[in-house]
């Protein structure tokens, strides 16, 4: 993935433009509107399938306690399918960069094996809130591009965690991550400038308001944003280029 321009990353596909996020339909819409990359989440089912899904449960049942067949029956009844990670990879191949978020620890090797079976390292990223997952990925293959996610909803260590997100140098060094992806509320106190000094591109999540997109992309000049509305973000960039011209 070359960061030779600001990246518009479709959050769970173009999730704001379709009925069901993290589906092939959402991925198709992301490509249709011109997104540079697709972010998706993965979890593991009871029978060992790695699937594309954000929440830890579906209709009150934990993903880890359901087989993929069980899940497929439930989701089909609601008019969609949760793709496997391999299906998502194959769909994205030769179309768009896939940005995979590990929602849990413990199956990093399986994810890497699946991705590298079909893609070269330039065609995917792996992101996580878990420092240990990122460290493990780099031990397996230092050429894989990793993204340190920052801005957990419920910080495990309270204020200490928040400070480590606002001033993440130690975590950046420990994980050897290639990029940093903070929640937009963390982007303050010269955040982007500090990360640029450490040569770490900043990919901000989840930016859905056009004014906030403009602030991040134009004013703060971040390397990219993750958004449910990639079409709006692309328009913001184009309108800025026109005004400069």
What are these regions (language model features)?
Residues 1-245:
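Phosphate-group recognition and catalysis centered on beta-loop-alpha active-site segments
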